[in-house]
Swiss-Prot record:
SMART domains to which the protein is assigned, alphabetical: Ribosomal_S10
GO MF term (any one): structural constituent of ribosome
Highest taxon, organism lineage: Bacteria
The protein's role, per its UniProt record: Involved in the binding of tRNA to the ribosomes.
InterPro entries in alphabetical order: Ribosomal_uS10, Ribosomal_uS10_CS, Ribosomal_uS10_dom, Ribosomal_uS10_dom_sf
Keyword terms of this UniProt record: Ribonucleoprotein, Ribosomal protein
Subunit structure: Part of the 30S ribosomal subunit.
NCBIfam families named in the record: PRK00596.1 (NF001861), rpsJ_bact (TIGR01049)
Gene Ontology CC terms: ribonucleoprotein complex; ribosome
Native source species: Buchnera aphidicola subsp. Acyrthosiphon pisum (strain APS)
Protein name listed in UniProt: Small ribosomal subunit protein uS10
Sequence similarity: Belongs to the universal ribosomal protein uS10 family.
Keyword DNA-binding on entry: no
Disulfide bonds: none
Amino acid sequence: MQNQRIRIRLKAFDHRLIDQSTTEIVETAKRTGAQVRGPIPLPTRKERFTILVSPHVNKDARDQYEIRTHKRLIDIVEPTEKTVDALMRLDLAAGVDVQISLG
């Protein structure tokens, strides 16, 4: 597995969950002897929704909601077999979306 790279992208709505997951991944990779770059915070995506409160009149009465999607990027530069096995066994929080790509 030399000369390969594992790129891990994490997405979550809660920044505490994503930070906890990134520390678990980085500690696991370093424990197995791999070189880690990151976590790199990517731009947070903010989606805003405006909803009319009144069903009939009062166009001025509106509520605004926002969903923030936090993203992190981790590169594992020189993974070993132990690193891949440890990352596969790692149990992360339920609210974190993980995308793994080999390159």
